[in-house]
């Protein structure tokens, strides 16, 4: 099939084929290989890395799906990883939920998923569980992604908005608000 069909979200054979041929292959890791409805994470590893858990979720519903420097998939990984990292945690695990519009080209989904896998792998993050739903044509705008991420916060780090004081120095890796401005620039 060249396009997403309602059957890809029905829990049947088409959905299993999509999961196995795309998601399992791209996001391959031991947690996904268990093929359970949840990821079973090793608490000892997280405890060894810190004394608190940073946990965040975000949804991505942008248009266009592809833009200079990235796409909705890369944005989903980077955005959620950043939300976890600003606490001082090292992002380790992500869940990923897709809402796909019937008729979405399979090549579009594959490009987004491949980008997500590459971005997560480069950051040392495992996508350990996920979900896929397909809605009727017109009920969504091509592709929506929800991610949730977690990582352990080292015991000696206590970052947060409430700890900021006048004179603190903030490090940023680019122009503030740049990604929002860039997305708007390409939709007008």
Q: Where are each of the predicted segments found?
A:
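Helix-biased detector of long, well-ordered alpha-helical tracts
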Residues: 1-184, 188
């Amino acid at each position: 099939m060249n396009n997403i069909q309602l059957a890809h979200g029905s829990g049947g054979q088409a959905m299993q084929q999509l999961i196995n041929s795309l998601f399992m292959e791209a996001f391959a890791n031991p947690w996904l290989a268990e093929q359970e409805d949840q990821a079973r994470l090793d608490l000892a590893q997280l405890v060894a890395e810190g004394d608190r858990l940073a946990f965040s979720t975000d949804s991505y519903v942008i248009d266009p799906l592809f833009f200079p420097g990235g796409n909705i998939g890369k944005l989903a990984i980077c955005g959620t990883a950043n939300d976890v990292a600003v606490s001082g945690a090292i992002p380790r695990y992500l869940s990923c939920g897709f809402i796909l519009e019937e008729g979405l080209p399979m090549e579009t989904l594959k490009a987004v998923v491949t980008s997500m896998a590459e971005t997560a792998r480069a950051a040392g993050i495992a996508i350990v569980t996920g979900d896929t739903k397909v809605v009727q044509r017109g009920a969504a705008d091509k592709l929506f992604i929800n991610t949730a991420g977690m990582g352990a916060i080292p015991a000696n780090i206590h970052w947060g908005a409430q700890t900021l004081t006048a004179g603190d120095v903030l490090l940023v890796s680019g122009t503030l608000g740049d990604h929002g401005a860039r997305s708007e620039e390409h939709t007008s």
